[in-house]
């Protein structure tokens, strides 16, 4: 990937992500696929489970077409990674789930099958279960449920909570502590503060970390207050979207994230699968387009 591209300020960069679908293209494609009738709710839930394990849209699309015992068979084939995929080559893992392999993956799939039997879609339904339709779930509740599962740690617990809120329409309440417990958004927030605010303070009067992070979050939420949160557009942008903007902006400034990066990478991973399964073709069709 070329590092030769203009670096954008965080507001310009964030607005691009939010308004073009490049913030979380996976979320947009899933919501569109379900709304178009290409994915039923059970298939969507199986897609999510496959994605949370392997973090690859092509693999998740292929797995989503399988039900019951067949789903677990292919989940284990992917976990063991001893056979070629239907698209050719090894079973991929996204970078964020690169450690989900070998014994960790095999043990995880074994325990998931033991828990959910012939209804693998029940995993997603469990982590987002509510007592009433109007109940809002605390982030920590959803994350804790996710982390009950072998091979699921704090980071994927955060991602699952975010996807339950933005894709499955289960309202989840996040707070700054949930977002800034990971190093990338914290480093990005501190980098932005150094750019904008550090010169205003003597070195011995620098605010505490929590105050800096809270101030950056509030600042960005205010700057994006006129934008609706994708893909549902059901509320203004809040801390969840700010977390994604911060992470991607840090990569952007370090030369690893040109505009349209995620859309290009996801489409590239999907294309070999689109010729092998209808779910991958539908998903690819619903992906946001580079403009």
Curated annotation (Swiss-Prot):
Source species, domain of life = Viruses
Which keywords does this Swiss-Prot/TrEMBL entry list? Host-virus interaction, Inhibition of host innate immune response by virus, Restriction-modification system evasion by virus, Transferase, Viral immunoevasion
> Which reaction equation describes what this protein catalyses?
5-phosphomethyl-dUMP in DNA + glycine = 5-N(alpha)-glycyl-dTMP in DNA + phosphate
Keyword Iron-sulfur included in the entry's annotation: no
Output the InterPro entries linked to this UniProt entry.
ADDT
Please list the GO terms describing molecular function: transferase activity
Catalytic residue positions: 243
**Which residue ranges traverse the bilayer?**
none
Q: Which cysteines are joined by disulfide bonds?
A: none
Please give the biological process terms from Gene Ontology that the record holds: symbiont-mediated evasion of host restriction-modification system; symbiont-mediated suppression of host innate immune response
Effect noted on mutating residue 247 to A: Complete loss of enzymatic activity
Explain the purpose of this protein: Transfers glycine to 5-phosphomethyl-2'-deoxyuridine (5-PmdU) to produce 5-Nalpha-glycinylthymidine (Nalpha-GlyT) as a step in the pathway leading to thymidine hypermodifications in the viral genome. As a final result of the pathway of hypermodification, 5-aminoethyl-2'-deoxyuridine (5-NedU) substitutes for about 30% of thymidines in the viral DNA. These modifications probably prevent degradation of viral genome by the host restriction-modification antiviral defense system.
In which family does this protein belong, per the annotation?
A: Belongs to the thymidine aminotransferase family.
Instruction: State the protein's name.
Output: Glycinyltransferase
Give the source species.
Pseudomonas phage M6
């Amino acid at each position: 990937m070329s590092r030769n591209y203009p670096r954008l300020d965080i507001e310009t960069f964030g607005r691009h992500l939010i308004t073009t679908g490049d913030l979380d293209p996976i979320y947009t494609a899933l919501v569109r696929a379900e709304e178009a009738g290409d994915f039923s709710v059970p298939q969507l839930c199986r897609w999510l489970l496959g994605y949370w394990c392997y973090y690859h849209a092509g693999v998740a699309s292929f797995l989503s077409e399988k039900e019951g015992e067949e789903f677990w068979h292919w989940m284990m084939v992917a976990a063991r990674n001893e056979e070629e995929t239907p698209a050719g080559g090894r079973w991929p893992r996204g970078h964020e789930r690169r450690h989900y392999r070998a014994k960790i993956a095999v043990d995880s799939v074994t325990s998931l099958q033991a828990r959910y039997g012939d209804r693998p879609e029940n995993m997603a339904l469990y982590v987002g279960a509510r007592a009433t339709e109007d109940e809002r779930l605390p982030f920590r509740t959803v994350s804790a449920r996710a982390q009950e599962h072998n091979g699921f740690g704090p980071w994927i617990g955060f991602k699952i909570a975010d996807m339950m809120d933005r894709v499955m329409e289960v309202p989840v309440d996040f707070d700054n502590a949930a977002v800034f417990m990971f190093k990338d958004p914290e480093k990005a927030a501190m980098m932005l503060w150094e750019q904008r605010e550090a010169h205003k303070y003597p070195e011995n009067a620098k605010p505490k970390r929590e105050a800096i992070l809270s101030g950056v979050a509030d600042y960005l939420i205010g700057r994006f207050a006129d934008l609706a949160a994708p893909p549902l557009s059901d509320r203004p942008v809040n801390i969840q979207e700010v977390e994604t903007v911060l992470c991607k902006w840090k990569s952007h400034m370090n030369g690893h994230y040109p505009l349209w990066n995620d859309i290009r990478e996801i489409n590239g991973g999907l294309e070999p699968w689109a010729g092998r399964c209808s779910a991958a073709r539908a998903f690819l069709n619903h992906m946001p387009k580079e403009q």
